[in-house]
UniProtKB/Swiss-Prot annotation:
Nucleotide-binding found in the keyword field: yes
Gene name tied to this protein: dcd
Protein name: dCTP deaminase
Catalytic activity as recorded in UniProt: dCTP + H2O + H(+) = dUTP + NH4(+)
Similarity field: Belongs to the dCTP deaminase family.
Length: 184
């Protein structure tokens, strides 16, 4: 597998719609950076958030996740309670080629503040808005800024095309739009 450079990312976004909307050059002035970097793409977080709350003293169960545990917010700044988390989504819609696997890493700006971003890999031929999970590991409230960088996607091109893609097996998160809760 090869890590793909900025030139390839730019070409795939422009000719194949791999990332829409696409920011061709990294934006950094007064914001948490986003756009193309040397070997990745820094995606932005949208204004759509679901913030975890323990109002109903719920148990978190990935097999039977209760939306009652979340409070919906559309805002420019999301405040995550101490030792809690929020779900969000990327501004960008991704269409992953059949011979590419994408991994995601959190932004160091957030990590240095105790905020961890988690995303599972984007599999070959998956498409949709990426649901992001922000964990506030601190004992204080933490801010997430909509419209700014949230995480970096690294594109790994396989030496051969996979036999079965995410689309082939009708993956449960295919084509997701908006913040998407766990599904079985």
């Amino acid at each position: 597998m090869s890590v793909m450079p900025d030139t390839w990312i730019r070409e795939m976004a422009k000719t194949k719609g791999m990332i829409e909307p696409f920011t061709e050059k990294q934006q950094r002035a007064g914001v948490i950076s986003y756009g193309v970097s040397s070997y990745g793409y820094d995606a932005r977080v949208s204004r759509e958030f679901k913030i975890f709350t323990n109002v109903d003293s719920a148990v978190v169960d990935p097999k039977s996740f209760s939306p009652n545990s979340l409070v919906d917010r559309e805002t420019d700044i999301c405040v995550i309670p101490p030792n809690s988390f929020a779900l969000a989504r990327t501004v960008e819609y991704f269409r992953i080629p059949r011979d590419v696997l994408v991994i995601c890493l959190g932004k160091s700006t957030y990590a240095r503040c105790g905020i961890i971003v988690n995303v599972t890999p984007l599999e070959p031929e998956w498409e949709g808005h990426v649901t992001l999970e922000f964990s506030n590991t601190t004992p204080l409230p933490a801010k997430i800024y909509a419209g700014e960088g949230a995480c970096q996607f690294i594109f790994l091109k396989g030496d051969t095309v996979c036999e079965t893609s995410y689309a082939d097996r009708s993956g449960k998160y295919q084509g997701q739009q908006g913040v998407t809760l766990p599904r079985l």
